[in-house]
């Protein structure tokens, strides 16, 4: 871990980091998060019985769109040409959906924030589409799972076993 913050200038004011001289490399980031709900809500999602439509299809598209809009939402993020965004859903068969986002680029800076934002917007979309029947849903455990590429190299979240 580094202790130097790069988003401040010599006057201690915010700045966007200059990446002009950085090398273009292949960069990948994976993030994850969960939403826990009443078991009946999860069953209705699986059965296609949510009035707003296909929850997972809409949430998947929302997550992809979010990754593409990251630089418009997070002030110091660079506009990055993404080469791929994929959203995956798994559930425990009871009350929790896990969302994983994989984001790729070939550029001068990483896509960790894009992956994290994709997960968060995907989860918020699930919440939005199901809130009429379950306002007690809990969004949690959002974190970067893995990132690779660039000067800082490879990172794996400490509690994630390496495969």
From Swiss-Prot:
Claim: Plastid is one of the keywords in the record: no
UniProt xrefs under Pfam families: MoaC
Gene Ontology MF annotations: cyclic pyranopterin monophosphate synthase activity
Active site residues per record: 128
Residues holding substrate: 76-78, 113-114
Keyword line: Lyase, Molybdenum cofactor biosynthesis
Gene Ontology biological process terms, A to Z: Mo-molybdopterin cofactor biosynthetic process
Assembly mode: Homohexamer; trimer of dimers.
Protein name: Cyclic pyranopterin monophosphate synthase
């Amino acid at each position: 871990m580094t202790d130097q913050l790069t988003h401040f200038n010599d006057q201690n004011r915010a700045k966007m980091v200059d990446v002009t001289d950085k090398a273009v490399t292949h960069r990948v980031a994976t993030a994850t998060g969960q939403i826990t709900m009443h078991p009946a809500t999860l069953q209705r999602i699986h059965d296609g019985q949510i009035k707003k439509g296909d929850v997972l299809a809409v949430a998947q598209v929302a997550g992809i769109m979010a990754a593409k809009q990251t630089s418009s939402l997070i002030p110091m993020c660079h506009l990055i040409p993404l080469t791929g965004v994929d959203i995956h859903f798994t559930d425990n068969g009871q009350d929790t959906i896990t969302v994983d986002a994989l984001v790729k680029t070939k550029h001068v800076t990483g896509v960790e924030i894009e992956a994290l934002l994709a997960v968060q917007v995907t989860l918020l979309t699930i919440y939005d589409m199901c809130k009429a029947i379950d306002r007690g849903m809990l969004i949690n455990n959002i974190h970067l799972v893995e990132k690779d590429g660039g000067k800082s190299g490879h990172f794996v979240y400490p509690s994630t076993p390496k495969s």
